[in-house]
Amino acid sequence: MERLAGIEIFKGFSGYITKITDLMQSQDETTSGCYKLVSLEGEDGSIVNFVVALNTYFVNHSVVYIGDKVTGYFDELAPVPLIYPPQYRAIIMVKNMPGENVKVDYFDSELISSDNYLKLNIAMFTQILLTNGQPFKRNLENRNLIVI
């Protein structure tokens, strides 16, 4: 896949949280406890670790616990250490909820997702929010979006 400037290629991994541990990023005490290593086990038994940082966005500002089913999204083209289990920097974390579907992707000028599985039809009453919960009134075309 070719990387376009400023566009992340999102890839997700879903599984149940088996462990959450503090991750030391440096000797700086001001960030102590701010970084977590979240271990997920997929339904097929595969294991993935996500580094959750201060800038990781949790959809709906959900708090996650051991046993929760979640999906972690990372930049598929970002460099990663060659270790087992694989370890990715979590960009977005979604706590999977019954009856709720979440799509994280780049949407083009026709509001079609990069994998062509979803086309957005925005209605007058559609809530469009920034990650901080404030309304967004601009054009949605050619952007990375989280669709719930």
Locate each region found by the language model.
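Short, flexible, surface-exposed loop segments at domain boundaries
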Residues: M1-L37, V59-L120, N132-I148
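Short, basic/aromatic beta-hairpin or loop at an interaction surface
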Residues: S39-V52, N116-T126
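A cross-kingdom feature marking solvent-exposed beta-strand/loop segments within repeated
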Residues: S46-S62, T126-Q134
